[in-house]
Amino acid sequence: MRLRFNKNAETSLMASPMTFKDFPIDNKKNTILEIGMGRGTMLTKLALMHPDIEYIGLEKYSTPAYSALKKAIDLNLENFHIIIGDAINLSTYFKNKIKTIWLTFSDPWPKKRHYKRRLVYRDFLKIYQNVLDKDGVVYFKTDNDMLYQFAIDELKEINAKIIYQTSDLHHCNFKIENVFTDYEEKFNKLNKNINFIAFTFN
C-alpha cells in the first residue's frame, strides 16, 4: 500500500487552495476530521456524499496527501480540505470545535518502547478531547488487534465513554455510515476482521 515518493507533492499541495496553510483556521461547526487520511479514499467519498458538511484530512506525509488532493480535484469537491501536519499539534489548527474525528488504520507502533506514539495513547486522547465538541464523537477503525485492545485500555484509563465497540465492524449492528479506506478494502477481501470503537469524553 506504500506510494512511491513524489518529490513534487509538497509543492503542489502548498499551491492548492484546498490545503490549509494559515492557522488556526475558522472551521465550520459541523467539521469532520480524519487523522491519518492517507490517500483520502474514505474522506473524499464522504465529502461527495455530503456537500453541506466540511471534511478535513490531516496527513503527516505529502505523497499520500497529494493523492487525496487529486481525488478531490477530480470530484470537484468544495467541502474538502487538507492539513499537512501532526496530530500532536491538533489544538493549534482550529478556532472552533470539531464535530467528529476519525482515526483510521493508524500505525500500530508494535514495539513496546514506542507505545507513546500510538494515536490512541492517552496523551493523544486528551488532545482530541480538547478539540472535540461537547457532543462530538471519535470513531476508531483498525485491523490490528493489539492496537484495538490498547485503545480500550487507554480509554478506560482516562475515563472516556465507550459508546460501542466491536472486533467485527463489517458484521455488527451498529448504525454508522462506514465508507471503506484503501486498507479496509484490502483487508475485507482477505476476510480480516476490522476492529471499531465509537467513543466520547462526556
From Swiss-Prot:
Classification via PROSITE patterns: SAM_MT_TRMB
Binding positions for S-adenosyl-L-methionine per the UniProt entry: E34, E59, D86, D107
GO CC, one annotated term: tRNA methyltransferase complex
EC number: 2.1.1.33
Record-annotated active site: D107
SUPFAM superfamilies, A to Z: S-adenosyl-L-methionine-dependent methyltransferases
Keyword line: Methyltransferase, S-adenosyl-L-methionine, Transferase, tRNA processing
Superkingdom, natural source: Bacteria
Keyword Transferase included in the entry's annotation: yes
Catalytic activity: guanosine(46) in tRNA + S-adenosyl-L-methionine = N(7)-methylguanosine(46) in tRNA + S-adenosyl-L-homocysteine
Pfam families: Methyltransf_4 (PF02390)
UniProt-annotated binding residues for substrate: K111, D143, T181, D182, Y183, E184
Biochemical pathway: tRNA modification; N(7)-methylguanine-tRNA biosynthesis
UniProt GO MF annotations: tRNA (guanine(46)-N7)-methyltransferase activity
Protein family: Belongs to the class I-like SAM-binding methyltransferase superfamily. TrmB family.
UniProt-listed NCBIfam families: PRK00121.2-2, tRNA (guanosine(46)-N7)-methyltransferase TrmB
Entry function: Catalyzes the formation of N(7)-methylguanine at position 46 (m7G46) in tRNA.
Protein name according to UniProt: tRNA (guanine-N(7)-)-methyltransferase
Annotated organism of origin: Metamycoplasma hominis (strain ATCC 23114 / DSM 25592 / NBRC 14850 / NCTC 10111 / PG21) (Mycoplasma hominis)
Record lineage: Bacteria, Bacillati, Mycoplasmatota, Mycoplasmoidales, Metamycoplasmataceae
